[in-house]
């Protein structure tokens, strides 16, 4: 744990305490400023109510048999565009029936995910993000890289911030002295394609929430990049199971790949929006040093537990290999 520094702190305050030119890589996932009230939030409340002790089933056996969503599923079960044979339908029949009786939907609570994430997203602004990019530029060493995941529809604004987030300077242009601003160079897009995307209102929106975008940017000089003919497209699943507890949690294998390609063992990696501590875990698993923070007390506590469990796993693997 000596290579992990994780604080319960606001991100800008955390960065302001770091020395200039001291960080090798920033890998982070700031709020996308996309919170909204929607039917998905109502469904989360509905599921929570049905999960309470003593809650009655919403539907009857007869309603399940005649449920319109089943259609011809007694013959085949359509998964995406692919008909699954009757045998597969029977395999899942008990699960779908249980879900429908309890929640009123064969999918149960599978897609009960909030779209209003809370104050940490709705109170974040583009002006605040601009302040973060300036700190990113200051704390990174020359040749250091920033990788920032952000909302697809605001990514151009982020690119413009990165291009002008450095210090100002004056230079002669013709007969006049003009003021210029330094910024990140070699700004590129990378794309994460989720191999198990979560449908967003799948009855109305046939396009699932299947991809996210990040920008990579280098501060001066030549950045660390240990790959050849890389197309910048990464196909990894969403985090699942007990270690998923943050609504915008990123894929651990994805972050491990990004850390391995854009840094060296022993390098210092920073994430001021640590969330579920995915960046920290990726650093632990690849031999890097991590420094980061999370301002939400709830997620900080859960992330601390995740870091501790991962350290215990690593210790166990190390002792068993001796």
Each language-model region and where it sits:
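S-adenosyl-L-methionine-dependent nucleic acid methyltransferase catalytic domains
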Residues: 1-198, 205, 209, 220-322
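Short hydrophobic/aromatic beta-strand or adjacent loop that forms the aromatic wall/cage
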Residues: 210-214
């Amino acid at each position: 744990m000596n290579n992990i520094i994780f604080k319960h702190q606001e991100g800008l305050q955390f960065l302001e305490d770091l020395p200039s030119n001291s960080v090798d890589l920033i890998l982070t996932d700031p709020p996308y400023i996309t919170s909204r009230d929607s039917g998905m939030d109502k469904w989360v409340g509905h599921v929570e109510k049905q999960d309470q002790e003593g809650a009655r089933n919403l539907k009857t056996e007869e309603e399940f048999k005649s449920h319109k969503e089943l259609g011809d599923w007694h013959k085949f079960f359509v998964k995406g565009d692919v008909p699954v044979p009757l045998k597969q339908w029977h395999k899942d029949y008990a699960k779908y029936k249980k879900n429908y009786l309890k929640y009123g939907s064969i999918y149960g609570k599978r897609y009960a995910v909030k779209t209003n994430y809370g104050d940490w997203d709705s109170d974040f602004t583009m002006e605040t993000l601009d302040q973060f990019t300036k700190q990113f530029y200051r704390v990174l060493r020359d040749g250091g890289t920033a990788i920032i995941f952000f909302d697809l529809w605001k990514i151009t604004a982020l690119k413009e911030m990165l291009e002008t987030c450095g210090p100002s300077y004056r230079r002669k242009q013709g007969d006049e002295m003009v003021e210029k601003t330094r910024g990140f160079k070699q700004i590129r897009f990378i794309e994460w394609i989720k191999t198990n995307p979560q449908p967003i209102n799948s009855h109305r929106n046939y396009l699932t929430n299947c991809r996210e975008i990040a920008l990579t940017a280098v501060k001066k000089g030549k950045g660390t990049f240990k790959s050849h003919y890389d197309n910048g497209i990464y196909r990894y699943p969403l985090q699942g199971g007990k270690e998923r507890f943050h609504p915008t949690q990123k894929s651990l294998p994805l972050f491990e790949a990004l850390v391995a390609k854009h840094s060296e063992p022993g390098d210092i990696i920073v994430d001021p929006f640590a969330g579920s501590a995915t960046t920290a875990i990726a650093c632990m698993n690849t031999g890097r040093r991590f420094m980061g923070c999370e301002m939400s007390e709830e997620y900080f506590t859960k992330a601390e537990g995740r870091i501790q469990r991962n350290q215990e796993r690593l210790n166990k693997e190390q002792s068993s290999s001796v």
